């Protein structure tokens, strides 16, 4: 059996620009992609914390160190500059491998500064 697992996550990044007329995709600072292990042209799901929109696109690299998160093409209708996003990439793997899998998670502050990375998500407490 194959399972779909979280592979990489950018947690709480802010949109820096939107471009409705760009060909599509989401441009992401190359440092951010590296931190979460997301590759250029990889499929990503984006969850907009501010408006509840959930949409899929693919990642393209923005200039390293730029802190850019640019939502482009039709997806630009799903976000505004300043919106808070969670960006995820997933992987399929065999059940046995999935049981030992740990995602790469990158956490950001309100200025899109990388704060830390982790190989697991915290346990949610009651």
UniProtKB/Swiss-Prot annotation:
Binds 1 pyruvoyl group covalently per subunit. InterPro entries: Asp_de-COase-like_dom_sf (IPR009010), Asp_decarbox (IPR003190). Is synthesized initially as an inactive proenzyme, which is activated by self-cleavage at a specific serine bond to produce a beta-subunit with a hydroxyl group at its C-terminus and an alpha-subunit with a pyruvoyl group at its N-terminus. The modification Pyruvic acid (Ser) is found at residue 25. It is found in: Cytoplasm. The keyword Lyase applies. It comes from the Bacteria. It is an enzyme of class 4 (lyase). The keyword Cytoplasm applies. Its EC number is 4.1.1.11. Catalyzes the pyruvoyl-dependent decarboxylation of aspartate to produce beta-alanine. Heterooctamer of four alpha and four beta subunits. NCBIfam families: panD. This is Aspartate 1-decarboxylase. The lineage of its organism: Bacteria, Pseudomonadati, Pseudomonadota, Gammaproteobacteria, Enterobacterales.
């Amino acid at each position: 059996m194959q399972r779909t697992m979280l592979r990489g996550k950018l947690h709480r990044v802010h949109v820096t620009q939107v471009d409705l007329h760009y060909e599509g995709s989401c441009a992401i600072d190359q440092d951010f992609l590296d931190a979460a292990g997301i590759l250029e042209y990889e499929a990503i799901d984006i969850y907009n914390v501010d408006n509840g929109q959930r949409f899929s696109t693919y990642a393209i690299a923005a200039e390293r160190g730029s802190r850019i998160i640019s939502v482009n093409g039709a997806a630009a209708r799903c976000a505004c500059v300043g919106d808070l996003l969670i960006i995820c990439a997933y992987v399929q793997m065999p059940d046995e491998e999935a049981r030992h899998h740990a995602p790469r998670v990158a956490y950001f502050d309100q200025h899109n500064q990388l704060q830390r990375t982790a190989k697991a998500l915290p346990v949610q407490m009651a």
